[in-house]
UniProtKB/Swiss-Prot annotation:
Main localization (coarse): nucleus
Any Gene Ontology CC annotation: nucleus
Species per Swiss-Prot/TrEMBL record: Mus musculus (Mouse)
Organism superkingdom: Eukaryota
Sections of the chain in a coiled coil: 299-379, 442-624, 652-1380
Protein name: Uveal autoantigen with coiled-coil domains and ankyrin repeats
An example molecular function term from Gene Ontology annotations: actin binding
This protein's encoding gene: Uaca
Mutant phenotype after disruption: Mice show a high incidence of inflammatory lesions in preputial glands. Cells around the lesions showed resistance to apoptosis.
Disulfide pairings: none
Amino acid sequence: MKSLKSRLWKQDAPGPTSPSSPTAVASTQSAEWNKYDDRLMKAAERGDVEKVSSILAKKGVHPGKLDVEGRSAFHVVASKGNLECLNAILTHGIDVATRDSAGRNALHLAAKYGHALCLQKLLQYNCPTEHVDLQGRTALHDAVMADCPSSIQLLCDHGASVNAKDIDGRTPLVLATQMCRPTICQLLIDRGADVNSRDKQNRTALMLGCEYGCRDAVEVLVKNGADLTLLDALGHDSSYYARIGDNLDILNLLKTASENTNKGRELWRKGPPLQQRNLSHTQDEGSVKSTQREQREPHSFQDLEIENEDLREKLRKIQQEQRILLDKVNGLQLQLNEEVMVADDLESEREKPKSLLAAKEKQHEESLRTIEALKNRFKYFESDHPGPGSYPSNRKEDMLHKQGQMYTTEPQCASPGIPPHMHSRSMLRPLELSLPSQTSYSENEILKKELETLRTYYDSAKQDRLKFQNELAHKVAECKALALECERVKEDSDEQIKQLEDALKDVQKRMYESEGKVKQMQTHFLALKEHLTNEAATGSHRIIEELREQLKDLKGKYEGASAEVGKLRSQIKQSEMLVGEFKRDEGRLVEENKRLQKECGTCEVELERRGRRVVELEGQLKELGAKLALSVPTEKFESMKSSLSNDINEKVKRLAEVGRDYESAQGEIRQLKRDLESVRAQHIRPEEHEQLRSRLEQKSGELGKKVSELTLKNQTLQKDVEKLHADNKLLNQQVHSLTVEMKTRYVPLRVSEEMKRSHDVNVEDLNKKLSEATQRYAEKKQEAERLLAENDKLTKNVSRLEAVFVAPEKHEKELMGLKSNIAELKKQLSELNKKCGEGQEKIRALMSENSSLKKTLSSQYVPAKTHEEVKASLNSTVEKTNRALLEAKKRFDDTSQEVSKLRDENEVLRRNLENVQNQMKADYVSLEEHSRRMSTVSQSLKEAQEANAAILADHRQGQEEIVSLHAEIKAQKKELDTIQECIKLKYAPLARLEECERKFKATEKGLKEQLSEQTHKCRQRDEEVKKGKQENERLRADLAALQKELQDRNALAEEAREAERALSGKADELSKQLKDLSQKYSDVKSEREKLVEEKAKQASEILAAQNLLQKQPVPLEQVEALKKSLNGTIEQLKEELRSKQRCLEREQQTVSQLQQLLENQKNSSVTLAEHLKLKEALEKEVGIMKASLREKEEESQKKTKEVSKLQTEVQTTKQALKNLETREVVDMSKYKATKNDLETQISNLNDKLASLNRKYDQACEEKVSAKDEKELLHLSIEQEIRDQKERCDKSLTTIMELQQRIQESAKQIEAKDNKITELLNDVERLKQALNGLSQLTYSSGSPTKRQSQLVDTLQQRVRDLQQQLADADRQHQEVIAIYRTHLLSAAQGHMDEDVQAALLQIIQMRQGLVC
């Protein structure tokens, strides 16, 4: 496979042909990647089967072709698990073993992502299972990592090697244990995985499981025979890794496993020597006992084991939660790293405008130079206008020559030998910044500053959050206060309205009454008038005066009534005014109420829901009340449980002590029996043996009765204990169910209130933060507007400087860079918009969660009545349990009294044993005497050895004396020789010589005699030494014989003991048989007596019948009837006898079975000391487990706090990133504004060009009026100017159309930019053409031919430039696509190994290019 580096090198490096040739690029692209390949890849990613099959039907399409990222459509389909697409590709035909850039084939990818069906399909097409990726892993490794047992089974069935190792030497079993997957470990072991396989550091799977705290996986490995004693390269074993992991469960498991292995080895080494000597019936009894021991386990151990298992499960859950939290923390850290990478990319892209500004400054300097040249030209035109004919032409020619020189120097400065695509590095490497040499120190300072700014943003965000929370709480409080005020105002207004309505009713009643009175007065007045008229006719003066007085009174009353009516009307008006004001107030209040109702409508809906929920919960609580009537609160229940468990443990201890005492008593009894029987068998008279046997039988019978009573009591106590355990289990289950229901359905009121407070505080803080953020946003907006205005000014100035005269190549380069920047910024804008949308969705989700939390907090509470009822029921159960405990204590006291009685009897038996021991002392030799005799023998041996040593010392001294004598003899011989020589020399006489010889002979004889005596003595000593050695050997043989005799006696004693045991067992059996036989004999005697009595009765009846027969004649029928009845009775009696015998046999069998059960119970019972030790060890382990649980809970709480802190930091960083993105959006808006300004400047420049053309026309007209000879030239110039005007107008129209299109659609921005650049190039070319035409007009007389030649050359240049631009664009876009794909994958977190390798290649290439 071709690497990414080689492809990039091919794209960047110039070929043998020209790099600007598009044919070469097209050929390489068609060979490497095709549009059909791209379509196939997209269809494979979408899972469109029809599209995939249609594309595959075309020629030249290969589904295994790799893209820039190093993957093919075949790999994509396998990784996504699309079975239909995979079938289509496989049926089309492909090499199944094709690999991607990471060395993985399709089988690897299907196993990695857990697609078992795709894996099965690939295996059907014979995809190899032994292929390895760049990390040395097979498909089985990936399946284990994906936790897919079905794919593992498929791979193992198709011959995948279970013990294959990767680069680090890890097998699939090692990876499974490292990732804590016990089921997969068991599956791999069942498939033949090596449990003790090692990696490159000599670490086994067990060591890694202990290090990572995978208790279940370690248990699986230990069960399947993992070696605990293996060491790694550093000399550490599995227990060391378990200590590093701080997992007590694993340490305990390893300890128990090592102890079991050690015990097994010891048993294997020692072997059972005594069991070989035992009889066959003893072996059978031992096997039966072992089976019964295995079947029966005490309840206390079961309870403790259950509790331990519960604690271990809790530990496992806590460990799993810790792992999940660690995974979350790692994920958050990865997100942080990705966001930091994105921020770095944004910073690098921000630095691009700086480089562009630097380039623009350079262009500004060049434009200043061109402006100066233009000024000189304008001066020349102004000075040349009024002069004569010959002189100005010469001056013009000089100026044109100067301008030609100036224009020729400018391209020479731009390195003519270098091709244009090599001038700007930013064209080929858009992500590299062409800034001047910036040091790493400045970059570090920038990063530090940005870090400080991020920290300030983080602090400000924290403060904003707190403020918003406070504001939220404040607003909630205000809403509540407003709601209360609204209700209060409603009530007041209702009361006032009622009062006003009552007052109106009273006023109306008064009005009606006053109107009635007025009507009465009117009628009365009319009546008076009539009466007065009548009396006036009569003319009585006195009556008239009285009537006048009455009239006055009536007028006064009428005026008072009218005044009252006016007052009432004024009161009514006032009340109406008040009612209007109240109505206005009511309207305002209604509006406020509506506003508050809109704000609190959701609250009311929530309250209704909560009310429904409360009703439902009340019903559930009522139902639970009945269930909880018998339950107990957790604290009291735990105290009760602890007290009950303590009492039960004490009782169990006492029972165990009683059992141990009972077992010890039985053991002592057995030993006494064995000793007594052995003594009797060897050295006791038969009479004494029978007496002792009778006594022992009596005692054994009494002890058997007591044992039976004790066993019955023990059974009753065990039943009581079992009942207590059952009650305890029921209570535990009830408490567990209640705790689960309380945890799942109810939340404490304190927690809900605290959550409400915290939410209120959060809302207030958020509101405050919102207000502050809005203020800051307004301030920043103002600053941004100010900066935009300044930027507009600067851009206008720059555009004015740039727009006068700019080189075409530089302008094209700038435009290409701007296009690339625009495209990148658009993509960034889309990404930022997506991120903003995601952030808004997250905010909505948080708001919904907040509302749901509020609902749940408000709806959950705990009533007090149920709690009191539960308390009462629990108190009653506690009293019941106390009573049961008192009864159990009484029973225990009875058992203790019986144990004391047994101890007294044991003391009596001990006394008998002492008597037997005294008899043994009298009959046998004691060990002390034997040791004394042995000591005397050893002393005699020591004395003999000492004497032997003395004899050897004397022998050595004699040998030394003999040696000294030999030396003296030799010296004397030498002297004799010398004397003889002297005699010979001096001629001594013969007599003397003879005498000397005699003397010498005498001395020789004496010496020889001495020698013989000494040799004789030596021989005697040697003989004595030999005799001592023989005596020593004989004594040693005697000692060995004595030791053998002692060993034989010990063996005989052991055999005698075993025989005594067997005899005692037989004696017990015989005694039982005797008892049974005696009982049977007594039963048979009683039955015989009954039968005798019945026989006598029958004989008397027969005699009576015979007498009757003799006295009276009886018919034969009666006699036969009597015979039949008698025969029937006889048969019935026989059947009854047989049934009784069967019952006897059954009872005997049951008795024998019960006796065997008793013996088995005695043998299988455990000592109390061992039980206490086990219990203490378990309690210690439970305490350690609880302590570790507390520590781990504290650690988990700390970790949760850390995770919450990390989440807050992540949120703050996200907010900071969002702020940065908003800033970048502002920068984009600035960029667009600058672009619009540039376009406006271009239009202004075109206007200026038009004005310049007009001025030029005027000058030409003046020249025509002055010079008639040059009319033809001026006409041609005018025609050319008109053509140029038309072209400028066309260009202006096209620019306007382009602007309209830009405003209409943002999709065609790139095409419009290209057109603008082409138009700008046309304008510049027209300028150059104008200059050339001016030179031609003044220099030659045939302008049309030269104009056509210039036009052709310009068109060729334009074509060349367009081709170069197209080639540069293609290369630029290809490189951008490569960079973007890898950077986007890195930013999105897809940092696979292939992406990392690609990024490393890019960095290396960058460094090479920079160098």
